[in-house]
Amino acid sequence: MVYPIGKRIIPPIVKFWIKQANGLQNVPKKGAFIVAANHASYMDHFIIMSTLVPYLDRKIHHLAKKEHFDNIFKKIWHTWVGAVPIDRESGGKEALMWAIKALNQGEIIAIHPEGTRTLTGKLQKGKVGVAILALTAKVPVVPIGLIGAFEILPKGKYIPKMRKATMNIGKPMAFGKYYGKKINKRMLREVTTRIMKEIARLSKQKYNFK
């Protein structure tokens, strides 16, 4: 019940904070894939979901830390976005397994490879969870760069400013050359870096991590 209600109410409201969404044609209409975006603000979820869900008319599952389910308002929002709680202290293995199963069933998973919101507005080092999902489920990654979301609602603030964000969507990234090979740390870091560099390009930033 929460999902259909939220689908009608939330996007028109969030639209006031969105300047433009570029590259929607790059988002696959069918099949499983991963949406990977930079994490600049709590507004990131609203902007991504309010743009992609109406466009695709499909539910997108979002991986979120379990603390986002600790009150009724947060719980309603995260239920709408199909969020799966991650216990970061345990490494989030349970949520990753759930996400892999969902991808294998043709679902869409949204994730922020950095793992947490930035304090400065700049990109942080990406964690390998996104690579684990992409290589294990053998699905493409759609990179997204958000520009301006940090200025709307930076970490530590609770009232969004009336500014506008731009969402740049890149072409799906395929990692077929790794399929069939034993997944190792080097491979995971290599794939993660490729994804983060594309997110950096789309968000007009630099990614200086290896």
Give the label of every model feature segment.
Residues 29-90:
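Catalytic core of membrane glycerolipid acyltransferases/transacylases, capturing the structured
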Residues 3-18, 75, 79-82:
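Short hydrophobic helices that act as membrane-entry/anchoring signals
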Residues 14, 55, 77-78, 102, ...:
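A generic structural signal for well-ordered alpha-helical segments
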Residues 16-20, 90-96:
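Glycine-rich, highly charged phosphate/nucleotide-binding loops
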Residues 8-39:
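Helix-to-loop junction immediately C-terminal to a conserved catalytic motif
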Residues 10-15, 85-89, 120-121:
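Short, flexible loop segments at the rims of nucleotide/cofactor-binding pockets, characterized by
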Residues 23, 38, 64-65, 82, ...:
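A secondary-structure boundary/capping signal
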Residues 94-210:
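Non-catalytic C-terminal accessory region of glycerolipid acyltransferases
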